[in-house]
């Protein structure tokens, strides 16, 4: 149905020394991320028409809720679109590429003064083949700025900076060193209940924060949940953080390109991934906070079993999955669920209710008995092998 994509993200063993040593060994020099637009005339600079990305940057600025640091960044980005403007230099150095997608690439960045390592998404300002990516970037910038202005959340990826250099936009966010939740499941199999609960609790808390402020993520899936730390013990689900810049949270909700207020008659091209859309979106285009809870139910099902609830072998066509989502109940009738607690199954069933008005909210999910069960009761059983190891891939969304 949906094919596997990029490999696991590169592990960064230290903040400064290892990156600089790596560059020295390659005989390379770090590229300075600086605002250095040139004042001399050139054919491109003479064009006064704004690119779609310019409008996206200004749109994000218009949606700003007054965060001083990021408002200044947007203002500088807007000014950078005008030829002949000198702007303040930004102190981020760029290193290895760690990801790629339709929008462009993601590279490691290091702040010259603090030594913080971050993820830097680099998007070309003018790419006729990717016009649809500009509204998505506008939504992402606006959503991350809103979250930051509201005080942020420990389980939502934090916006560090946004600026334009030359004809590229740079979106700097905190780095999650453990890679995607999806990659963890593929590599190590399903999670023990204790660790799955930790992830579910943090995601429910993040969604509760967003929903209270009228923001719907609209694309919750394992690929968009990032692990803050790398795995140390695959069987017990132990993780390790080793850096003062790293968050105390286990996971981070990322990729806000679909985020926005609740909507009706939603264009399916603007939101989500097919395998994680609830019945109401498929039937009428209605996308509310309940959509995020359905998707989180799918994620929890995958964490505990290694399979998608409506595509158990990972090979079904989109049309078949859509039919199952609309018409068939979730099932736990295969061996991966033999040792999973009844409370866990009950929670998933209440998240995957077809009627969105009956579906658990994020706050209700946090009060469910399974979310508050004792660690001893949940720790029974080790990780089970992923179905991927037996040639049964779980669905993956597009990059």
UniProtKB/Swiss-Prot annotation:
Binding residues annotated for ATP, in chain numbering: 98-106, 121
Record's note on what induces expression: Up-regulated by exposure of sporangia to cool water, which initiates the cleavage of sporangial cytoplasm into individual zoospores.
Keywords: ATP-binding, Kinase, Nucleotide-binding, Serine/threonine-protein kinase, Transferase
SMART domains cross-referenced by the UniProt entry: S_TKc
Annotated GO MF terms: ATP binding; protein serine kinase activity; protein serine/threonine kinase activity
Domain Protein kinase intervals: 92-371
Gene3D superfamilies: Phosphorylase Kinase, domain 1 (3.30.200.20), Transferase(Phosphotransferase) domain 1 (1.10.510.10)
Catalytic residues in the record: 219
Top-rank lineage group of the source organism: Eukaryota
Pfam families documented for this protein: Pkinase
E.C. code: 2.7.11.1
InterPro entries noted in UniProt: Kinase-like_dom_sf, Prot_kinase_dom, Protein_kinase_ATP_BS, Ser/Thr_kinase_AS
Catalysed reactions, as listed in the record: L-seryl-[protein] + ATP = O-phospho-L-seryl-[protein] + ADP + H(+); L-threonyl-[protein] + ATP = O-phospho-L-threonyl-[protein] + ADP + H(+)
Location of the region described as Disordered in the Swiss-Prot/TrEMBL record: 30-50
PANTHER family named in the record: SERINE/THREONINE-PROTEIN KINASE (PTHR24347)
Function summary: May regulate an early stage of the zoospore pathway.
Membership in a protein family: Belongs to the protein kinase superfamily. CAMK Ser/Thr protein kinase family.
Subunit text: Interacts with BZP1.
Name used for this protein in its record: Serine/threonine-protein kinase PKZ1
């Amino acid at each position: 149905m949906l094919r596997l994509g990029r490999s696991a993200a590169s592990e960064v063993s230290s903040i400064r020394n290892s990156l600089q040593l790596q560059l020295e060994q390659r005989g390379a020099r770090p590229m300075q991320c600086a605002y250095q637009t040139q004042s001399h005339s050139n054919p491109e600079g003479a064009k006064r028409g704004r690119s779609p990305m310019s409008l996206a940057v200004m749109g994000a600025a218009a949606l700003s809720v007054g965060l001083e640091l990021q408002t200044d960044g947007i203002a500088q980005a807007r000014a950078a679109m005008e030829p002949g403007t000198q702007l303040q230099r930004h102190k981020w150095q760029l290193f290895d590429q760690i990801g790629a997608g339709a929008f462009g690439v993601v590279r490691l960045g290091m702040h010259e003064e603090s030594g913080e390592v971050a993820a830097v998404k680099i998007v070309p300002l003018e790419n006729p083949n990717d016009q649809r990516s500009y509204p998505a970037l506008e939504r992402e910038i606006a959503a991350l700025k809103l979250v930051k202005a509201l005080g942020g959340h420990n389980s939502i990826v934090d916006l560090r900076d946004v600026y334009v250099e030359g004809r590229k936009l740079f979106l700097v966010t905190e780095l999650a060193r453990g890679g995607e939740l999806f990659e963890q499941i593929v590599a190590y199999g399903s999670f023990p209940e204790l660790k799955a609960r930790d992830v579910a609790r943090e995601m429910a808390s993040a969604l509760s924060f967003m929903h209270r402020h009228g923001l719907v993520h609209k694309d919750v899936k394992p690929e968009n949940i990032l692990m803050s730390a790398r795995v140390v013990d695959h069987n017990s689900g132990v993780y390790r953080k080793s850096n003062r810049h790293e968050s105390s949270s286990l996971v981070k909700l990322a990729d806000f390109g679909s985020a926005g207020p609740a909507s009706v008659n939603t264009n399916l091209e603007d939101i989500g991934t097919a395998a994680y859309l609830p019945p109401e979106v498929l039937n009428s285009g209605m996308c509310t906070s309940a959509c995020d809870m359905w998707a989180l139910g799918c994620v929890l099902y995958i964490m505990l079993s290694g399979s998608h609830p409506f595509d158990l072998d990972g090979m079904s066509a989109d049309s078949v999955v859509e039919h199952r989502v609309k018409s068939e109940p979730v099932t736990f009738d295969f061996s991966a669920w033999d040792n999973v607690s009844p409370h866990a199954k009950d929670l998933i069933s209440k998240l995957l209710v077809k009627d969105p008005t009956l579906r658990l909210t994020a706050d209700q999910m946090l009060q469910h008995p399974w979310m508050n069960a004792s660690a001893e009761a949940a720790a029974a059983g080790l990780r089970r092998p992923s179905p991927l190891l037996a040639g049964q891939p779980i669905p993956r969304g597009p990059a």
